[in-house]
Amino acid sequence: MAKKIVGFIKLQVPAGKANPSPPIGPALGQRGLNIMEFCKAFNAKTQGMELGLPIPVVITAFADKSFTFIMKTPPATVLIKKASGVQKGSAKPHTDKVGTLTRAQAEEIAKTKQPDLTAADLDAAVRTIAGSARSMGITVEGG
């Protein structure tokens, strides 16, 4: 018989930097889950990734105080800012442009994000990433 699910916890945790301090500690503590067990498992899974890159994670809490977690790909905005060398997006995205993103960079981000996007193919995923970049005030070259 399957375990009874008590709830889901959605967090964004920096890769390799999970520790019991907020927001992780209180979120897991409310459900009675072992905080250090999650931190060790998460840090081990994110070992090969860039340190500090925010990783969305969905933790499934079970009635017997056990848990499983699924890691998603980093947010598109973070990847776009990193690729274009921008600290933050524009306050007026359609009038003030803050950076540029090439088609090749957009394709690279789309390949990274492909598992989490609903796009049918790579070209549709690139258009999704390009749209996100434009809404941040970043010009997309060649697309």
UniProtKB/Swiss-Prot annotation:
**Pfam families for the chain:** Ribosomal_L11, Ribosomal_L11_N
- What HAMAP family does the annotation carry? Ribosomal_uL11
Residue spans making up a coiled coil are: none
Cellular component GO terms held in the UniProt record: cytosolic large ribosomal subunit
Query: What does the UniProt record say this protein does?
Result: Forms part of the ribosomal stalk which helps the ribosome interact with GTP-bound translation factors.
For this protein, the record's SUPFAM superfamilies field holds: Ribosomal L11/L12e N-terminal domain, Ribosomal protein L11, C-terminal domain
BP GO annotations:
translation
Return the protein name.
Large ribosomal subunit protein uL11
Checking PROSITE patterns in the record gives: RIBOSOMAL_L11
Subunit architecture: Part of the ribosomal stalk of the 50S ribosomal subunit. Interacts with L10 and the large rRNA to form the base of the stalk. L10 forms an elongated spine to which L12 dimers bind in a sequential fashion forming a multimeric L10(L12)X complex.
Native source species: Bordetella pertussis (strain Tohama I / ATCC BAA-589 / NCTC 13251)
Its post-translational modification remark reads: One or more lysine residues are methylated.
Q: Which gene encodes it?
A: rplK
Q: Which domain of life is it from?
A: Bacteria
UniProt keywords (A-Z) are:
Methylation, Ribonucleoprotein, Ribosomal protein, RNA-binding, rRNA-binding
Q: Spell out the molecular function terms from Gene Ontology.
A: large ribosomal subunit rRNA binding; structural constituent of ribosome
Q: Give the protein family.
A: Belongs to the universal ribosomal protein uL11 family.
